[in-house]
C-alpha cells in the first residue's frame, strides 16, 4: 500500500481521481493500492515558551533560546491561553493511521519551501520513518500530475529546501518571541508585537508616511516653445529652471527679443525595447497593486485559486524564466486562448508570430518557472 499526502483536500481529490483512489473515508481516500490523505496547510507549529518552562513576560527569562525546538499541533485561542485545534488533532490521527498502513509515502504538498515544511513537520511530529518520495509539479492539470507521478523524485533531494524552511520558521520564532517580550517588558504598557517581517515593513511604512508628511513642494518655472516642421509638431522645454517667477519672465523676454529659435543639431537614435520578462509572484503583486489596487495578499489568493483551478502554474515562484521544453508548448497554449472570447483578440494577434525568447533560459529557472497559463481553458 502506498500513502500520498497533499496540502489541501481539493488537491488530494484531484490526485486521487487520477490514481484511482475513489473510495471515500473519514479524512482520506483509498483504492487501487493507494491511501490519499491531506493536511489543512500547517498542522504543526513550534511550541510556545511555556513548553520550555517560561511563563509570562520576565526580563530575567530573556533571551529564550531553546536547545531543541519542539513541535506541537496547531494551536487556537481558548478561554485561558491556547489549546490544540480539535480538527487538527483529528486529521493528524488519520494521517498517522494512513502512514502506519503503508510501505512508502508520496509527498504531494505544494512544491515549494513551505509545502516541504508542512510535510516534514507532520512526518517528524508523528515519528514516522517510512521512506518517502516527492511529487514535484508546477501545475495541477491532469497532464502535469500524471507526468509528475511518472517522475517521482527522491525525498532527500529536497533536504536543503526543508532546512531552509526550518531555519526561516525558527528565526521567526526567535526574533518574534524575544523581541516582543523584550519591548513589552521595557515599555511596561501592554504587549507590543515585533516580528522578522512585520517590524521592518512597519518601519518602511512609517518612514514613507513621515517623508510625505514633511514634504514641502517647491515651485519652479521653465520655458516651453511649441513649433512644427512639416507635419511634425513638438514642444521644446528649457533645461534651466527658475525658482523665482520674475527671473523666468525675464528669460522669456530675452527669447522673444531674439526673434527666433535655431535648431543647432539633431540627434537620431534607433532603439529596441524588449518586452518585460514573464511574471513571478512579486512582479505580479506589484502590477496588480499599481493597476488594480490589489493588496499582495489578495493577488496571492487569486493566483492560488487559479492554480488550484488548473488554469495557472504554481504561484509562489521567484523565477521570471521558463525552460525550453515549456517554451515549445506556448504557441499551442496561446492558440487555445482563441476559444475564450475575452482573450481571442490577443491570441489572434500572436497567431503565426514567433514568440519572443527573452524569458527562455533553463539556467535561470529556479524550483519553479515563471507564471504561465496551462493547457486548460478558463471556465473548464
Language model features with spans:
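Conserved, well-folded catalytic cores of nucleic-acid-processing
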Residues: 18-22, 98, 105, 125-129, ...
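Short, solvent-exposed helix-loop connector elements
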Residues: 183-191, 377-380
Amino acid at each position: 500500500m502506498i500513502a500520498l499526502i497533499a496540502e489541501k483536500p481539493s488537491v488530494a481529490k484531484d490526485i486521487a481521481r487520477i490514481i484511482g483512489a475513489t473510495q471515500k473515508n473519514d479524512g482520506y481516500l483509498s483504492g487501487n493500492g493507494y491511501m490519499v490523505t491531506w493536511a489543512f496547510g500547517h498542522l504543526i507549529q513550534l511550541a510556545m515558551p511555556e513548553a520550555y518552562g517560561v511563563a509570562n513576560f520576565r526580563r530575567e527569562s530573556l533571551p529564550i533560546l531553546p536547545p531543541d525546538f519542539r513541535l506541537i499541533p496547531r494551536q487556537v485561542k481558548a478561554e485561558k491561553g491556547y489549546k490544540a485545534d480539535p480538527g487538527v488533532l483529528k486529521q493528524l490521527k488519520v494521517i498517522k493511521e494512513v502512514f502506519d498502513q503503508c510501505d512508502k509515502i508520496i509527498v504531494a504538498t505544494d512544491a515549494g519551501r513551505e509545502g516541504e515544511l508542512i510535510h516534514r513537520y507532520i512526518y517528524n511530529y508523528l515519528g514516522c520513518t517510512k521512506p518517502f518520495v516527492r511529487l514535484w509539479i508546477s501545475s495541477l492539470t491532469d497532464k502535469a500530475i500524471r507526468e509528475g507521478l511518472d517522475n517521482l523524485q527522491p525525498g532527500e533531494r529536497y533536504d536543503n529546501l526543508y532546512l531552509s524552511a526550518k531555519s526561516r520558521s525558527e528565526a521567526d520564532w526567535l526574533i518574534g518571541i524575544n523581541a516582543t517580550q523584550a519591548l513589552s517588558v521595557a515599555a511596561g504598557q501592554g504587549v507590543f508585537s515585533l516580528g522578522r517581517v512585520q517590524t521592518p515593513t512597519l518601519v518602511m511604512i512609517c518612514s514613507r508616511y513621515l517623508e510625505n508628511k514633511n514634504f514641502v513642494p517647491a515651485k519652479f518655472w521653465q520655458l516651453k516653445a511649441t513649433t512644427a516642421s512639416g507635419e511634425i509638431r513638438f514642444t521644446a522645454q528649457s533645461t534651466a529652471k527658475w525658482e523665482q517667477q520674475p527671473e523666468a519672465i525675464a528669460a522669456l523676454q530675452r527669447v522673444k527679443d531674439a526673434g527666433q529659435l535655431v535648431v543647432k543639431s539633431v540627434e537620431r537614435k534607433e532603439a529596441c525595447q524588449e518586452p518585460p520578462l514573464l511574471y513571478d509572484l512579486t512582479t505580479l503583486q506589484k502590477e496588480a497593486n499599481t493597476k488594480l489596487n490589489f493588496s499582495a495578499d489578495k493577488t496571492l489568493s487569486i493566483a492560488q485559486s487559479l492554480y488550484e483551478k488548473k488554469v495557472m502554474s504554481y504561484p509562489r515562484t521567484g523565477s521570471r524564466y521558463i525552460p525550453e521544453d515549456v517554451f515549445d508548448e506556448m504557441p499551442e497554449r496561446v492558440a487555445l486562448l482563441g476559444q475564450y472570447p475575452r482573450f481571442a483578440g490577443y491570441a489572434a494577434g500572436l497567431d503565426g508570430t514567433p514568440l519572443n525568447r527573452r524569458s527562455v533560459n533553463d539556467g535561470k529557472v529556479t524550483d519553479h518557472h515563471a507564471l504561465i497559463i496551462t493547457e486548460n481553458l478558463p471556465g473548464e
